[in-house]
Amino acid sequence: MNCSKFFILCFSFLFSFAQAQNLALTKKKNLNTRIELGFDRGIQLSKNFPILKSGEQFNLSISKLYGSHFEAGIGVGYQNLGDEQFMPIYLLLVGKTKAGSGPYIESSVGYAYGENSKYEHAVISNFEGGKYFSTGIGYEFNIKNQYSFLASCNYIRQQSQVKHYEGETVNYIENLTFDLIVFKIGLLLK
């Protein structure tokens, strides 16, 4: 997972650099940077039985404001669910009811790379990430024209697979689904 943490760190520096370079042009380009921390709770569904999961996540995204009610962008995150760690890369869509402070809805779709500590050194099994989807509602508290505090509640559906090998061929694929409720807080840099 060190590679994933390194990628997130590099992505963070890229966003910070992009935000710093565009500080004077922010009004013209309407670029927003979101930094969010979340607490996850949910279940992992497999063919055997559901498993209760808890964890935390960190998301970093950059988006462009189109008008005063819609923004679209890209993001990356890190999600730790104990044995499983995911690194989603996603497209972010946000709809606002009004400019400034107020409620918003958000949706993310993408792919998450995954690792599982149980399968890290396994020879006959391999854990892989999969499709990532998130949707939720939140409230933006405008602090100044340059900053906002964010609070949201989201539903996340994360898919993954465990491939079991016999020799070099895949003998069995176990599809896993993680259904999570996430409470996030964050900072929006405008």
Predicted stretch roles:
Residues 153-154:
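Internal, hydrophobic beta-strand segments that form the core of beta-sheet-rich folds
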Residues 175-190:
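Outer-membrane beta-barrel "beta-signal"
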Residues 1-30:
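Cleavable N-terminal export/targeting peptides
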Residues 41, 56-149, 189-190:
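Gram-negative (and chloroplast) outer-membrane scaffold detector with strong preference
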Residues 148, 161-163:
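Outer-membrane beta-barrel porins/channels
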